[in-house]
């Protein structure tokens, strides 16, 4: 597991109150992990803080699964 993957899963676990080891990469934040729209906003803010990146609103709409978050952060960090 990459450092980015581990950190994304940890942020998701803390935000949604679930164990990081139970989070699958293909899991949808809303459908599989029970996140609501406020949780998604807070997750995006957490990713921004944890990785020192900026995620524009139009990009945040594309971050719907754990893997899409990992891919997005990886791309932003280049």
UniProtKB/Swiss-Prot annotation:
Keyword Glycosyltransferase: no
Residue ranges of domain Carrier in the record: 2-77
Keyword vocabulary terms for this entry: Cytoplasm, Fatty acid biosynthesis, Fatty acid metabolism, Lipid biosynthesis, Lipid metabolism, Phosphopantetheine, Phosphoprotein
BP GO terms, sorted: lipid A biosynthetic process
Modification after translation: 4'-phosphopantetheine is transferred from CoA to a specific serine of apo-ACP by AcpS. This modification is essential for activity because fatty acids are bound in thioester linkage to the sulfhydryl of the prosthetic group.
PROSITE patterns for this protein: CARRIER (PS50075), PHOSPHOPANTETHEINE (PS00012)
Pathway(s) of this molecule: Lipid metabolism; fatty acid biosynthesis
Modified residues (O-(pantetheine 4'-phosphoryl)serine): 37
Spans traversing the lipid bilayer: none
GO molecular function, one term: acyl binding
Location of the protein in the cell: Cytoplasm
PANTHER family: ACYL CARRIER PROTEIN, CARRIER DOMAIN-CONTAINING PROTEIN
UniProt xrefs under HAMAP family: Acyl_carrier
Entry protein name: Acyl carrier protein
Source organism per UniProt: Acinetobacter baylyi (strain ATCC 33305 / BD413 / ADP1)
Name of the coding gene: acpP
């Amino acid at each position: 597991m990459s450092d980015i993957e581990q950190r994304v899963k940890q942020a998701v676990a803390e935000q949604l109150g679930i164990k990081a080891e139970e989070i699958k990469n293909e899991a949808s934040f809303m459908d599989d992990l029970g996140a609501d729209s406020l949780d998604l906003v807070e997750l995006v803010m957490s990713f921004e803080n944890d990785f020192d990146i900026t995620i524009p609103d139009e990009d945040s709409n594309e971050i719907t699964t754990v893997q899409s978050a990992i891919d997005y952060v990886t791309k932003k960090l280049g």
